Amino acid sequence: EFTLALVEDKVVGMGKLTVLFDGSAWLELLRVHPDFQRQGVGAKIYTRYLEQATAFRCPAIRMYTGAKNIPSAALAQKNGLHRGPEFCSMTLNLQNIPWEKEHLQGFCLANGQQAQELLLPMKEQAGGFFSINHTFYAVNPATCKGMAAAGWVYCAGENALVLGARFQPEKVWHIGAIAGDLEKNLRFAIARAAQCGVEQLSFH
């Protein structure tokens, strides 16, 4: 659901709640016009967030913010959220990166059962979350099955990776997880993304 905050029929803030594969609530796009910050607009949007999460019976509510975005973190904590793991991101520009068709060989899309078998053991290594488009998905069976259904889980024997995009797939694909031969997986990720005309790869 997309929420708008209005003052005298003027849009001064917005926010979106998305229900993820495991039913948890993901809070995103929270923005308040500079002229209306620190006036309770963000708090009102959070009130709506919590109403929605209750109505959807979400087992958890999560969000992402930059480590230096203190106001965003403070507002979230004021509304009952607490700090989770911190992640660093890396980006690779694919222009002029060499790749070969042979790097695609052996990989196929995993089904839900395969995804669970391959990805669940990675929970601790991944810090409990797989990230796609700065959306952090809790590692659990429902997430694994949902990612497989979305076409994000590739496998080749004991090698596996989560690779895809929740939005703007023409610009950036995100590596959510890697298991097995790191070099082989990365070569596949680069080749697959480049084959589809994607501009960048990102990894948390």
Predicted regions, residues:
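Conserved active-site alpha-helix within GNAT-family acetyltransferase domains
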Residues: Q39, A43, A67-P85
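Short strand-connecting beta-turns/loops that link adjacent beta-strands
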Residues: E8-K10, L20-G23, K68, G84, ...
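A short, internal acetyl-CoA/4′-phosphopantetheine-binding micro-motif in the GNAT/acyltransferase core
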Residues: L30-Q37, W173-E183
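Conserved GNAT acetyl-CoA-binding A-motif
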Residues: A25, A53-K68, L75, C196-H204
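Amide-forming acyltransferase catalytic core, primarily the GNAT-like/NAT-type
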Residues: N79-P169
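Conserved acetyl-CoA pyrophosphate-binding loop and the N-cap/start of the following alpha-helix
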Residues: F36, G40-R48, K184-F188
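Structural motif
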Residues: A110-Q113, G176-D181, F203-H204
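Conserved beta-strand in the GNAT
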Residues: L4, K10-T18, W26, R31, ...
